[in-house]
């Protein structure tokens, strides 16, 4: 099959499956009918049925990635609109994100250490709460497995976006700052998309949480590895 035709088919497959997954969730509101999850499972099913490799899918998937990279600029709008509230709460934002990052590191590092996993596995899993573009680079530079890091980043994001609303209700989080930072810190872009569905203010704080988590983690993960290895 011509590469351009295959790329177009993969793009159409992704867009169509996501569209119907979104419509399904709108008709049957349920956190487990997450459009990203349903569309991903649908894509995997189609690839397996027709024997299409990951590289074959990425002939079209890479174009979608380029478009998504450009759309990140859209996150600047909620940040700009809520800039005054962000400036008024800088210390709270930084302290909250730093605490979340450290708790994540402790959970992953101590658990894997206790079970005797190697440095490579620990490095692969530590960036799981960082947005993919940064997390992959951190894992690669420290000797982790890129493909597994991507898998854990996606899984973390999906779990956060699916269970986040239930956990926020359970914790009785009312503040848009708390909701947004929780989503951005724990489940990066997936969580930010979910926060934006709630309201633009939560989306703004989720964006800043996601950005700070990526920056802090990319600095602290190498330090942690140097200290213990």
UniProtKB/Swiss-Prot annotation:
Compartments in which it is found: Cell membrane
GO process terms (BP): killing of cells of another organism
The membrane topology term of the UniProt record is: Multi-pass membrane protein
**Which InterPro entries does the record associate with it?**
CidB/LrgB
Going by the entry's taxonomy, the superkingdom of the source organism is recorded as Bacteria
Does Transcription regulation show up as a keyword for this record? no
Q: Single GO cellular component annotation? A: plasma membrane
Q: What residues form the membrane-spanning segments?
A: 4-21, 30-52, 62-79, 90-112, 149-171, 204-226
Q: What is its main location?
A: membrane
Sorted UniProt keywords: Cell membrane, Cytolysis, Membrane, Transmembrane, Transmembrane helix
Tagged with keyword Membrane? yes
Short name of one Pfam family for this protein? Answer: LrgB
| Family to which this protein belongs | Belongs to the CidB/LrgB family. CidB subfamily.
Q: Which PANTHER family match?
A: HOLIN-LIKE PROTEIN CIDB (PTHR30249:SF17), PUTATIVE SEROTONIN TRANSPORTER (PTHR30249)
Entry function: Increases the activity of extracellular murein hydrolases possibly by mediating their export via hole formation. Inhibited by the antiholin-like proteins LrgAB. In an unstressed cell, the LrgAB products probably inhibit the function of the CidAB proteins. When a cell is stressed by the addition of antibiotics or by other factors in the environment, the CidAB proteins possibly oligomerize within the bacterial cell membrane, creating lesions that disrupt the proton motive force, which in turn results in loss of cell viability.
- Protein name as it appears in the record: Holin-like protein CidB
The scientific name of the source species is: Staphylococcus aureus (strain NCTC 8325 / PS 47)
């Amino acid at each position: 099959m011509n590469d351009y035709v295959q790329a177009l088919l993969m793009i159409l497959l992704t867009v169509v499956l996501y569209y119907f997954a979104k419509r399904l969730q709108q008709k049957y509101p349920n956190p487990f009918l997450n459009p990203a999850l349903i569309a991903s499972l649908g894509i995997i099913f189609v690839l397996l049925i027709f024997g299409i490799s990951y590289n074959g899918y990425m002939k079209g998937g890479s174009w979608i990635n380029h478009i998504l990279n450009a759309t990140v600029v859209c996150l600047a709008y909620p940040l700009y609109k809520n800039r005054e509230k962000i400036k008024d709460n800088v210390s709270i934002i930084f302290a909250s994100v730093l605490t979340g990052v450290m708790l994540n590191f402790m959970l992953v590092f101590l658990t894997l250490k206790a079970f005797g996993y190697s440095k490579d596995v620990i490095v692969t899993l530590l960036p799981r709460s960082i947005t993919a573009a940064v997390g992959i680079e951190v894992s690669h530079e420290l000797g982790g497995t890129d493909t597994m890091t991507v898998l854990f980043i996606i899984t973390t994001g999906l779990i956060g976006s699916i269970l986040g609303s239930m956990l926020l209700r359970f914790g009785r989080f009312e503040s848009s700052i708390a909701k947004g930072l929780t989503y951005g810190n724990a489940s990066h872009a997936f969580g930010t998309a979910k926060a934006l569905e709630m309201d633009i203010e939560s989306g703004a704080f989720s964006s800043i949480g996601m950005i700070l988590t990526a920056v802090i983690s990319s600095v602290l993960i190498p330090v942690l590895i140097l200290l213990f290895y």
